[in-house]
């Protein structure tokens, strides 16, 4: 009917229909969630090409990585037109977005910088490679990402006066104390305290900017970060004095193989799960020659104890995760971060989308036995 009224082509039809398909994610009633694809592992594709592929694979939207050509922080921070153009690309393929991600720049904020960082950092952050200067430039860029995210979300088609889902930047923090994880040479708590103090000092101004822009920062709890399990996540949160803009991008794949209860993580931080990755891993495999630390082997080496798998093919119990997310009232997207060195990525991303969509469900709105009561009959 819209086409008959004069919309000139399919792109216009999609752009007109797109805002009508949004729902209020702050509603007390949790609908089955949008399934999105994190674009970080697809940065070799242009955003238009990836958007077309994601739509074909059945995705509802994209979580835009701040590398490749998917999302340019510097442009988005100053240009409304650039943000609108990003949305037009998404809308042309019937896609939406709820988050952007800055893992690579975030990694450099607290890390002990070495030559490996040059490969993942933009030239304006790496500069001449002086470690402390790199950390400071990374901090400034991450703070700017809050403004870029706010501009992008404000340009969302059909957006009302408020965000339909709290604006969020997912990312890493790096860590000045990760190298001491094994506590040898003997390491006391004072040494680790200094690491958390360093994190708080560097992230304090960043979180101030996130508060100014009304954007959340969601740390993906992950080895090499200031928080990599439940205990260190609690400590990181305490270090920033519970700053309301600091929370977590939940990802079970980085917890399970460590022996961390990845469902308990959700229940431990019910008001700090700002975003959720659906990513799978298996553990307890290999030939017994490689342990949890990886043995300096590459992913997919058959000797490995653990590896990332296409969603649904690993050892993560996603049923338990969905129940826990429902219990805490998480109403945001389920964003698939796809990694599996043994599988074609297009096949894997398509099957992962199908798996997650089939698994997700809307919580019950009434007690299952309420119909026994005569007043309800």
Give the residues covered by each predicted segment.
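Acidic/histidine-rich catalytic cores of soluble enzymes
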Residues: 61, 100, 182-315, 364-376
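Conserved, mostly hydrophobic/aromatic
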Residues: 54, 62, 90, 100, ...
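Short, acidic/polar
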Residues: 43-54, 137-148, 258-266, 318-320
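Active-site acidic/histidine proton-transfer and metal-coordination neighborhood
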Residues: 23-24, 49, 53, 92, ...
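Glycine-rich, proline-tolerant flexible connector loops at the mouths of alpha/beta enzymes
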Residues: 65-87
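Catalytic domains of carbohydrate-active enzymes, especially glycoside hydrolases
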Residues: 50-68
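Active-site beta-loop-alpha junctions enriched in small/polar residues
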Residues: 38-42, 65-69, 102-105, 174-176, ...
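Hydrophobic faces of well-ordered beta-strands that scaffold small-molecule active sites
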Residues: 33-39, 62-64, 97-102, 169-171, ...
């Amino acid at each position: 009917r819209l086409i008959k009224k004069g919309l000139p082509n399919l792109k216009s039809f999609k752009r007109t229909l797109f805002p009508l398909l949004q729902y209020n994610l702050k509603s007390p009633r949790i609908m089955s969630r949008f399934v999105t694809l994190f674009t970080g592992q697809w940065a070799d594709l242009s955003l238009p090409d990836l958007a077309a592929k994601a739509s074909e694979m059945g995705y509802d939207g994209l979580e835009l990585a701040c590398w490749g050509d998917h999302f340019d922080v510097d442009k988005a921070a100053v240009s409304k037109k650039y943000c609108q153009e990003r949305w037009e690309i998404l809308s042309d393929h019937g896609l939406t977005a709820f988050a952007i991600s800055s893992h690579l720049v975030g990694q450099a904020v607290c890390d002990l910088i070495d030559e490996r960082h040059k490969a993942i950092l933009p030239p304006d952050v790496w500069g001449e490679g002086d470690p402390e200067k790199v950390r400071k430039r990374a901090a400034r860029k991450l703070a700017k990402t809050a403004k870029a995210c706010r501009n992008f979300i404000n340009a969302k088609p059909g957006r009302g006066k408020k965000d339909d889902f709290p604006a969020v930047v997912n990312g890493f923090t790096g860590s000045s104390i990760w190298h001491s994880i094994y506590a040898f040479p003997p390491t006391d708590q004072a040494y680790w305290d200094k690491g958390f103090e360093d994190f708080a000092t560097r992230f304090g101004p960043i979180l101030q900017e996130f508060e100014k822009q009304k954007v959340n920062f969601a740390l993906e709890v992950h080895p090499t970060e200031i928080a990599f399990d439940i205990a260190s996540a609690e400590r990181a949160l305490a270090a920033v004095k519970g700053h309301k803009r600091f929370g977590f991008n939940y990802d079970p794949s980085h917890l399970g193989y460590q022996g961390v209860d990845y469902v308990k993580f959700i229940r431990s931080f019910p008001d700090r799960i700002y975003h959720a990755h659906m990513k799978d891993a298996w553990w307890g495999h290999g030939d017994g020659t490689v342990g949890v630390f990886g043995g300096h082997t590459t992913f997919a080496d058959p000797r490995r104890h653990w590896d990332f798998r296409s969603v649904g093919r690993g050892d993560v119990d996603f049923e338990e995760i969905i129940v826990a997310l429902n219990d805490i009232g998480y109403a945001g997207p389920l964003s698939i971060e796809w990694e599996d060195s043994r599988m074609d990525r297009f096949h894997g991303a398509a099957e992962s989308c199908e798996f997650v969509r089939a698994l997700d469900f809307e919580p019950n709105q009434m007690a299952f036995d309420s119909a026994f009561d005569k007043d309800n009959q």
